[in-house]
């Protein structure tokens, strides 16, 4: 008997993100509600969460704990079985799995924590791999594999690819028809490996990339991806753009960074912000001055202007040291 007939999956929801923000935690709860309702309509009897339920590996505030328990209960009541992968953010230590932040799962008998690799029938489900566990992957023959994997050449976000550290590689999954994984938030695939995309956009590293949500897989079929229609979104615009076409560009629950490319006063800029935020129910509208500094005495030259985000990410990616975890540094920066 197969582990599932029709499975619904999501990943990397990160309860407790943004210092335990109530707004973010409520977004997470609203997403889980939508996920369960959608899975029920699609007749999914099984759910798999692919890792990173919590954001902070060392501390979880009381409000976040309450959201965690209520949403684990919601998942438990919505499915016959829920397989729950421990991601790196769910572990107190990144290099071992002995302590995790989701021990609440023991309250729900049909929520099954994946603390060690589980193979049942033609399905393998793996937690965040530690030490040399990756070396066992080529020996696994399962048709379907679910995990929380860190694979080189895939994008950690829209700009930065995961560097190759000479360990787990895409060719190690030659025996699988499909590999589904969390960890990198951008939805992407290469051959048989699918990063399904996290639950919804979390920060400006996700700006303009709304392909997030859930995945549904019927045994023997092809994966189907669905985007949460009420998700918060992130955008970067120029002021001239939003003044010209506000109705087309500004949306409900939007976080918006706007570069001031017009000659306006502080009072005018503040008026625009105070008008647009309530009118379009924006979560955030940040007005950023456009700074261009050119030496008047110099001859004309081509200047390549880079955003602060680009500069910081390039500098982190250029670090050549085994003492630093580039992926972790990028994750910390993106969530500032």
Q: Which sequence ranges carry the predicted segments?
A:
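Conserved beta-strand elements of the Class I
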Residues: 8, 122-124, 215, 233
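Conserved beta-sheet core of the metallophosphoesterase superfamily
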Residues: 158-223
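Active-site neighborhood of phospho(di)ester-bond hydrolases with catalytic His/Asp-centered motifs
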Residues: 9-11, 46-52, 81-88, 112-115, ...
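Accessory, non-catalytic peripheral segments of nucleic-acid enzymes
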Residues: 41, 218-336
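Acidic, histidine-bearing metal-coordination/catalytic regions of metal-dependent phosphoesterases
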Residues: 1-18, 326, 332-335
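Conserved catalytic scaffold of divalent metal-dependent phosphoesterases
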Residues: 68, 86-171, 196-199
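Core catalytic region of metal-dependent phosphoesterases/phosphodiesterases
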Residues: 4-6, 17-117, 172-176
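Active-site environment of divalent metal-dependent phosphoester hydrolases
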Residues: 14-18, 55-58, 85-96, 131-133, ...
């Amino acid at each position: 008997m197969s582990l599932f007939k029709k499975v619904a999956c999501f990943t990397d929801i990160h309860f407790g993100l943004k210092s335990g923000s109530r707004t973010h935690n409520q977004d997470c709860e609203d997403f889980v509600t939508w996920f369960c309702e959608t899975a029920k309509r699609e007749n999914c009897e099984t759910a798999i969460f692919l890792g990173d339920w919590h954001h902070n590996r060392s501390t979880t505030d009381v409000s976040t704990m309450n959201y965690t328990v209520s949403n684990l209960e919601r998942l438990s009541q919505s499915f016959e079985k829920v397989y729950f992968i421990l991601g790196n953010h769910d572990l107190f230590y990144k290099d071992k799995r002995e302590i995790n932040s989701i021990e609440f799962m023991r309250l729900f008998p049909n929520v099954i924590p994946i603390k060690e690799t589980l193979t049942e029938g033609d399905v393998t489900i793996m937690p965040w791999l530690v030490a040399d566990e990756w070396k066992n992957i080529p020996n696994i023959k399962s048709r379907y594999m679910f995990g929380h994997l860190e694979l080189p050449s895939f994008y950690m976000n829209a700009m930065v690819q995961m560097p190759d550290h000479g360990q787990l590689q895409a060719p190690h999954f030659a025996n699988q028809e499909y590999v589904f994984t969390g960890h990198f938030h951008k939805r992407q695939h290469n051959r048989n490996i699918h990063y399904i995309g996290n639950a919804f956009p979390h920060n400006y590293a996700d700006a303009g990339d709304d392909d997030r949500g859930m995945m549904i897989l019927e045994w023997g079929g092809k994966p189907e991806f669905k985007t949460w229609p009420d998700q918060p979104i992130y955008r970067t615009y120029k002021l001239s753009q939003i003044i010209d076409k506000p109705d087309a560009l500004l949306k409900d629950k939007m976080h918006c960074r706007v570069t001031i490319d017009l000659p306006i006063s502080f009072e005018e800029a503040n008026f625009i912000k105070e008008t647009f935020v309530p009118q379009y129910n924006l979560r955030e509208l940040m007005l950023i001055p456009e700074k261009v500094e050119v030496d008047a005495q110099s001859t004309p030259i081509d200047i390549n202007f880079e955003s602060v985000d680009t500069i910081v990410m390039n500098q982190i990616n250029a670090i050549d040291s085994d003492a630093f975890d580039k992926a972790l540094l990028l994750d910390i920066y993106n969530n500032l």
